[in-house]
Amino acid sequence: MSPLREVVSVFLRLGVVAFGGPAAHIAMMREELVRRRRWVSDAQFIDLLGLTNLIPGPNSTEMAIHLGYLRAGAWGLVLGGICFIVPAMLIVMALAWAYVRWGGLPVATGVLYGVKPVIIAIVLQAMWGLARTAVRGPLLAGAFVVAAALALAGVHELLVLFGAGGVAALVVPRRRAVAGAVAALAWATPARVMAAAAVAGGVTLGTMTLVFLKIGAVLYGSGYVLLAFLRADFVERLGWLTDRQLLDAVAVGQVTPGPVFTTATFIGFLLAGWTGAVLATVAIFLPSFVFVAASRPLLPRLRGARRAAAFLDGVNVAALGLMAAVTWQLGRAAVVDPLTAALALAAAVLLVRTRVNSVWLLAAGGALGLAWRALHA
């Protein structure tokens, strides 16, 4: 199989089975592309993860774009991202059609009941493997712990990441660094797009597209941050959605596989049908392709300068700290009784002791969840 066809095959499959949000997506990519296929080493994977945390946009999608480029060049960059996004987009479009047609959402509580604890095990296993590579010495270990604590305390993700990078950079001997270029890249384009999208009025495809383009270009952080942006624009400023419609859209984005940014697909369908769904999806994801392509030349320079390399090391462990905080928060919601605790423990043991594909664990968890719900209906 050619590298490009391999990129298409891998990311189409991940786009179908990658439930659980960015942390779980990244864990699955590590298992498939580091452990199984050996496209990159753990050190390279962590560097890419650190770089995606410094630019706006959905981290897991940007990892797919980066990894596609490493495997198959420019076309791999484009198709890696597209193939990861398209399955989720099609699923969300189908759910949006059903929502409009019947005024409600298909019930998936049984599947999610069994899938969520398996996702927690997958994320923990990946985080352990990445931490063994990234956390080198007491300074970086301390940065990991502090980053996790700050994230749990509600400190903004961007402050945690740049703070950890800055502290790590300050403790190495003075050398010329290029870390400032990352910050410039992260803020220059979003400022222009934000200004361009500051328009209001009736529901028009142009206005909707510009709003989603702005969100994709400036948004750091979790799905909760996405919810805040969407509410400010579509509920409060433009008045195009109700709070209930927005919450339903976010729920669909969270329970379907692939990037949670496909919430935009659902909203686009509600506002302008099939055309709106496609335009909203393209607009919110397009900045990620631009940022990844623009930031790729920075990675060798970041690793080539000692201070900049230390900055990236700090960002990497802070990203893992954020991942730990998210896993703790998700785990409290996922492991709710003895059965879900047993599912999480069994999945963790299988992941550590065997090379079982996480897709089979997710399928087993979903089937057990459906059976349990059927017995207790």
PLM-predicted stretches and their roles:
Residues M1-I55, H66-T256, V260-A377:
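Multi-pass membrane proteins that catalyze or facilitate reactions on polyprenyl-/lipid-phosphate substrates
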Residues N59-E62:
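Conserved beta-loop-alpha segment that forms the PLP phosphate-binding cup at the N-terminus of a helix
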